[in-house]
Amino acid sequence: MWAPERSAEEQGNLTRSLGSSEDCGSVSVVFPMTMLITGFVGNALAMLLVSQSYRRRESKRKKSFLLCIGWLALTDMVGQLLTSPVVIVLYLSHQRWEQLDPSGRLCTFFGLTMTAFGLSSLFIASAMAVERALAIRAPHWYSSHMKTSATRAVLLGVWLAVLAFALLPVLGVGQYTIQWPGTWCFISTRTGGNETSSENNWGNIFFASAFSFLGLSALVVTFACNLATIKALVSRCRAKATASQSSAQWGRITTETAIQLMGIMCVLSVCWSPLLIMMLKTIFNQTSVEYCKVYTEKQNECNFFLIAVRLASLNQILDPWVYLLLRKILLQKFCQAVSQKQREEAATLIFTHLSISRTEPGEARVLFSKSKC
């Protein structure tokens, strides 16, 4: 049940296609090792910051959002810990995947893990976008209905639904197969074959298409909700333009939030769109990237597919920085810049007063003490 079925011709082609994957082992192993280390550090740091903020009383209104960030960081970190070590061991051992995994069960587990954790990240990002949009556009409904228990239920529901979808190949709908250059497994996009395998081919088409459409749908929901949030923030900022201090504060908040949301949309689109669109393209064109070493004319397509998968994996590293860590760093830099500017303005003002009215030194200390960020 766990082992993907292959014909004799397919097995021979696959063996030839993966034979040269050992040649790039010493070079390519740097990529998964770097991703594992950076991803683990970033997500662990994000989880630490979330746990500290979650315990504070003043963050009660942010608990739903903090739960989503913590769940996303945990999802990304566990996904990397389950997949990256397998790739590293395969590169360092200079073995083909079939030598390391003759039964094919590890391949199925690897593909299931990539599918489940990849879709989970996308859907959690969508849930966070919906949560932000509701908090900004419907604050009264949000405060009365959006409890932490509801957030936990939604996150758990996302996880269970994605896991059920990823288990479809185990039940016979779709396949997880070895992908070029033979160091990882993922959803099969193979659509050709003889009549005996037509049922498997239709299963491959359905499963791969469903994965792509689900991923693209999650991206669309995230984009729509983030744009709605930005629009609502800009409208509220204009409405508060009557009071200068309130207007300046809301302008700063709107700018920071808009930059962060646009950064999230850019990262998601760059990391996931190439893989999802290319999977649909290979299905509609009835092509496959599983036998790259056999058909040399597909070499460019195979290289692009590998880059697309690496970009999707890179999203697990960028998530904690885009959602939490980078925002904290930018806020600290902003505070330092404002504080420095206030000190310079205070020093200029003090120098002017001293030169004109010979102000007592005690007043300078008072002005400096009020110029803190």
Swiss-Prot record:
The chain crosses the membrane at residues 31-55, 69-89, 109-130, 153-174, 205-230, 261-284, 305-326. Belongs to the G-protein coupled receptor 1 family. Residues 1-23 are annotated as: Disordered. Pfam families: 7tm_1. Gene3D superfamilies: Rhodopsin 7-helix transmembrane proteins. Disulfide bonds join 107-185. Its main location: membrane. GO terms for cellular component: plasma membrane. Receptor for prostaglandin E2 (PGE2). Required for normal development of fever in response to pyrinogens, including IL1B, prostaglandin E2 and bacterial lipopolysaccharide (LPS). Required for normal potentiation of platelet aggregation by prostaglandin E2, and thus plays a role in the regulation of blood coagulation. Required for increased HCO3(-) secretion in the duodenum in response to mucosal acidification, and thereby contributes to the protection of the mucosa against acid-induced ulceration. Not required for normal kidney function, normal urine volume and osmolality. Residues 10-20 have a biased composition (Polar residues). Keywords: Cell membrane, Disulfide bond, G-protein coupled receptor, Glycoprotein, Membrane, Receptor, Transducer, Transmembrane, Transmembrane helix. Interacts (via C-terminus) with MKLN1. GO terms for molecular function: prostaglandin E receptor activity. Residues 1-30, 90-108, 175-204, 285-304 are extracellular. It is a multi-pass membrane protein. Glycans are attached at residues 13, 194. It comes from Sus scrofa (Pig). Residues 56-68, 131-152, 231-260, 327-373 are cytoplasmic. This is Prostaglandin E2 receptor EP3 subtype. It is found in: Cell membrane.
